[in-house]
């Protein structure tokens, strides 16, 4: 059993990680940590997340000097569900002691220091780790994940978008010069637990945000190898992302070629389901799956992708990366 530590366990993604680690046959939940100054320190995990009363009642430990010493000397791997700049500070400390780090923040996803000052509001000081980090898009990057010590788990919108677009891009089916258009909606849990007016019960409404400046647009483009036009929306529901993507196909591309591109890409990869009918949030909420379907008319293609933003868009994809890194079946503990 691998002693597994979660830092940032009070948040939504951290909570999902805790439940997945608890149920994983090869992992032991060794510690749930929050920042030393957190108001949640010493509270029971289940007092914040009552769905796990009686199942996960461990205390949330402060990440103070004693906590760091315990992790550095006794843990086998670390999951970071922390703010981007916090992950950028903590990851090198764990890596220096030989601990594999699986980071759910955006701190190591894009190999460009300027990206972080432009889109994340902090100066990234560790170019070497940016180069060493493996992007944890599990179905597409397993060799790099297995070889790396630092795995940058993709963002939720990028996961939904890249799973839908990479089969087409890899097969060379997208028209030259065409920017795929991604229209995506996420539940309010994507904004985290911190209270805000626009995500409060009486205020939340389907609405666009982040036009031309959302940090996930360059992440998608970087890992697709192609510029995209990305418009996210806040949805008035708890969890899940639905991405509707518009793509112009290269001249002469047939529906059979499109079908074969998706079938080849996801053969033997059970956590991506090619549903044959347009997916829905209901079909993926609280599951580790990405559901994809598509329809072609002439040279235009509509691809729809659905995931749970807290699972396939965060915690369960991190579990896939752990499974790949340690040689387990990628779906272990998930299905």
From Swiss-Prot:
Pathway: Amino-acid biosynthesis; L-arginine biosynthesis; N(2)-acetyl-L-ornithine from L-glutamate: step 3/4. Keywords: Amino-acid biosynthesis, Arginine biosynthesis, Cytoplasm, NADP, Oxidoreductase. It catalyses: N-acetyl-L-glutamate 5-semialdehyde + phosphate + NADP(+) = N-acetyl-L-glutamyl 5-phosphate + NADPH + H(+). It comes from Aeromonas salmonicida (strain A449). Pfam families: Semialdhyde_dh, Semialdhyde_dhC_1. Catalyzes the NADPH-dependent reduction of N-acetyl-5-glutamyl phosphate to yield N-acetyl-L-glutamate 5-semialdehyde. The keyword Nucleotide-binding does not apply. It is found in: Cytoplasm. One of its GO terms (molecular function) is NAD binding. GO terms for biological process: L-arginine biosynthetic process. Its main location: cytoplasm. Coiled coil: none annotated. CDD domains: AGPR_1_C, AGPR_1_N. Its EC number is 1.2.1.38. The active site is at residue 156. Belongs to the NAGSA dehydrogenase family. Type 1 subfamily. InterPro entries: AGPR_AS, AGPR_type-1, NAD(P)-bd_dom_sf, NAGSA_dehydrogenase, Semialdehyde_DH_NAD-bd. It comes from the Bacteria. It is an enzyme of class 1 (oxidoreductase). This is N-acetyl-gamma-glutamyl-phosphate reductase. GO terms for cellular component: cytoplasm.
